[in-house]
Amino acid sequence: MATTLLIGSCEPFSGKSAVVLGLARLLGRQGVKVLFGKPLATTLQNPADAHGDRGGAVIDADVRFVGQTLGLADNQLIPSLHVLAPETAHARLLASDVGPGPGFEALREQLAAVPDGVALLEAAGSLHEGLLYGLSLGQLAEGLDAPVVLVHPWNDSCSIDSLLAAKAQLGHRLAGVVLNAVTPEDVPMLRAEVVPAIERLGLAVLGVMPRSPLLRSVTVEELARRLDAQVLCCRDRLDLLVETLSIGAMNVNSAMEFFRRRRNMAVVTGADRTDIQLAALEASTQCLILTGAGDPLTQLLNRAEELEVPLLKVEHDTLTTVEVIEQAFGHVRLHEAVKATYAVRLVEEHCDFSPLLTQLKLPAIAG
């Protein structure tokens, strides 16, 4: 029978998929068969996926990406039982339906039928998300009698409250936590002082992962979608990753000095600031976002085409544009190959799953 392990979090976009990728890769290298699924789907590639494929199976987009990245066969991808969406939530609420349905028993039977390996199941975004579907983290842990690893962003010592609340709810099923998105310069202090203190509270710390601009980055295509922007050039470069945001509102000399200190930027500036726009194109700029009235000069378009930097034109003012972009950082799915590769490396370098594997009676991972 396959061992089931739940990967959960106290809040959305905590880094669960990154940990799944890293842990699954490590298990695979040890010859352990890995299955992966999300009982409650949260991301679909298109609306038609909500009705299922492969004979009615609903496969979450995150599950598809992880499967493709790890080279998992179709029978190693576990279908979702329900789709988290306003429409399905409304229907269940009106029907006063808060049970997981017969699919949950089918999931248990499916896992029991697998002779060996590990089934990694990614829970919804928070401890309570999924209650309406009978598929919250606590319900899954109890219903499947499965241990839980929590991935939790660590800002400061106040971050412990959410973990203590999770421990109170999950009890002995909480097998360990991974502290994620830690300020890089704070990692040594956390390992030396904070981790021992957390473990004295009964929480096993399996890793301390530094914050990564790459993993928080967003594609130009995603920014264009969120901003409802007009793409003026370089549509074939919308897969570029934006790690930082710069606002071109200063004089051109100050702007050039500022731009030189940044990397992989999205630069937001007024459509009438051609001097700033041209300066930005000469820096580490992934896209140039023009706000306000007016069209860019032909000189700018030609230079952007030459340097293969997408130009976006938006109807929003600069403040609104900046707010939309800042909201996007760290709130996008891990669906790019370069991010997946980096996530695996982060987990390998900053996590030690040996205590967890001992608890699960699996072979220890060689260092």
Please name every model-derived segment.
Residues 4-5, 33-35, 64, 75, ...:
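Structural motif
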Residues 5-10, 14, 18-102, 106, ...:
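N-terminal phosphate/diphosphate-binding loop that engages ATP/GTP or pyrophosphate donors
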Residues 9-10, 23, 39-40, 80-81, ...:
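Fold-independent oxyanion-binding glycine-rich loops
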Residues 82-85, 91-99, 196-216:
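Ligand-binding beta-strand-loop-alpha-helix segment within the catalytic cores
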Residues 91-133, 138-143:
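Phosphate-binding/switch loop-helix module in NTP-utilizing enzymes
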Residues 112-115, 256-265, 280-284:
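Flexible, charged surface loops at secondary-structure boundaries
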Residues 123-203, 272-335:
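Conserved catalytic-core segment of NTP-binding enzymes
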Residues 208-269, 328-367:
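Non-catalytic interface/targeting segments
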